[in-house]
């Protein structure tokens, strides 16, 4: 077997392992969320299927798989089917450039940050397609909310990272992690971290920024007409987005795989898991603001913070050069 073929097979195997790990982490997070919410709300949570309810996730998957794959007769069939596929794959493709360890990652791109912002932006199309193709007023209103919120906060998401790019001089995520060997970016880039955290919650439509779904207002928003595995793709895609944002926070601000004693993979996984639990804690503890308050917070608070962070970082770098 030639070296090139061996290398190709290794890369394919590596990509498959990362794919299974991401989907598994996103699916398992849904179970952990239900257990933690039950703990914090003083109730039992899922505890009937398997020991400690561990097989509840498998039961839910079987249920979704065997539910009727119904498409409304008034829907645009092709776009209706395409929407959940885009929602599921966009965040997975974005994960391709995230370095898990010094030697483990699917791709090492010099423009890794730009790639993530571009690919993650495809999720907006999934929301718009779902809302428009469903031909339902609540679905359309939810998709319009989601697209406005996502497009707005993706601006802040990108601007919050420009301070890191100015500081490290690279869009490569591996270079950014290596630059944090002595000091994590969360210290000099604290404003960038805060705005990235807010924007990450908003882009993934998580509580308290879950305005596109707002059950009390929009009857579950843009995926109201979806059922079975199509709804399951939206559901798992949301949790994969949380895994992606958590891993990016760790990679960009908390040193990635760097840490004492433990192997690099365990440090990366432990830090990522901590932020995934933090996302769940936000859902359990915060109320949902109005949609106009969410948009005002982005443009009146997050945008100025990102610009201030860029100016401070540029000034510090310029002073160090001189």
From Swiss-Prot:
Domain of life: Bacteria
Protein name from the UniProt record: NADH-quinone oxidoreductase subunit H
Enzyme Commission code: 7.1.1.-
Subunit structure: NDH-1 is composed of 13 different subunits. Subunits NuoA, H, J, K, L, M, N constitute the membrane sector of the complex.
Source organism: Shewanella oneidensis (strain ATCC 700550 / JCM 31522 / CIP 106686 / LMG 19005 / NCIMB 14063 / MR-1)
Transmembrane annotation, as ranges: 12-32, 79-99, 111-131, 151-171, 183-203, 234-254, 262-282, 301-321
Catalysis: reaction(s): a quinone + NADH + 5 H(+)(in) = a quinol + NAD(+) + 4 H(+)(out)
Entry function: NDH-1 shuttles electrons from NADH, via FMN and iron-sulfur (Fe-S) centers, to quinones in the respiratory chain. The immediate electron acceptor for the enzyme in this species is believed to be ubiquinone. Couples the redox reaction to proton translocation (for every two electrons transferred, four hydrogen ions are translocated across the cytoplasmic membrane), and thus conserves the redox energy in a proton gradient. This subunit may bind ubiquinone.
UniProt subcellular location: Cell inner membrane
GO biological-process terms attached to the record: aerobic respiration
Key words, A-Z: Cell inner membrane, Cell membrane, Membrane, NAD, Quinone, Translocase, Transmembrane, Transmembrane helix, Ubiquinone
Enzyme kind, highest EC tier: translocase
Entry's Gene Ontology cellular component terms: plasma membrane; respiratory chain complex I
UniProt-listed InterPro entries: NADH_UbQ_OxRdtase_su1/FPO, NADH_UbQ_OxRdtase_su1_CS
Gene: nuoH
Entry similarity comment: Belongs to the complex I subunit 1 family.
Entry keyword rRNA-binding: no
């Amino acid at each position: 077997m030639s070296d090139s073929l061996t290398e190709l097979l290794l890369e394919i195997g590596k990509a498959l392992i990362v794919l299974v790990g991401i989907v598994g982490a996103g699916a398992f997070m849904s179970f952990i969320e239900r257990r933690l919410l039950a703990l914090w709300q003083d109730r039992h949570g899922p505890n009937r299927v398997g020991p400690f309810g561990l097989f509840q996730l498998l039961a839910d998957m079987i249920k979704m798989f065997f539910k009727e794959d119904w498409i409304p007769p008034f829907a645009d069939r092709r776009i209706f089917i395409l929407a959940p596929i885009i929602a599921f794959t966009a965040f997975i493709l974005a994960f391709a450039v995230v370095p898990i360890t010094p030697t483990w990652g699917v791709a090492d791109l010099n423009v890794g940050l730009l790639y993530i912002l571009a690919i993650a932006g495809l999720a907006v199309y999934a929301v718009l397609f779902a809302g428009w193709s469903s031909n339902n007023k609540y679905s359309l209103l939810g998709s319009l909310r989601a697209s406005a919120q996502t497009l707005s906060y993706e601006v802040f998401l990108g601007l919050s990272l420009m301070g890191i790019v100015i500081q490290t001089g690279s869009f490569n995520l591996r270079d950014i992690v290596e630059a944090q060997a002595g000091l994590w970016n969360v210290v000099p880039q604290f404003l960038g971290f805060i705005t990235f955290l807010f924007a990450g919650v908003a882009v993934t439509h998580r509580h308290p920024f879950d305005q596109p779904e707002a059950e009390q207002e929009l009857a579950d928003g843009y995926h109201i007409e979806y059922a079975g595995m199509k709804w399951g793709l939206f559901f798992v895609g949301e949790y994969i987005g949380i895994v992606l944002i958590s891993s990016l926070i760790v990679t960009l601000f908390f040193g990635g795989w760097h840490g004492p004693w433990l192997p690099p993979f365990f440090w990366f996984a432990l830090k990522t898991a901590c932020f995934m639990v933090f996302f769940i804690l936000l859902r359990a503890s915060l109320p949902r603001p109005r949609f106009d308050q969410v948009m005002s917070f982005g443009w009146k608070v997050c945008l100025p913070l990102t610009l201030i962070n860029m100016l401070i970082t540029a000034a510090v770098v310029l002073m160090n050069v001189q």
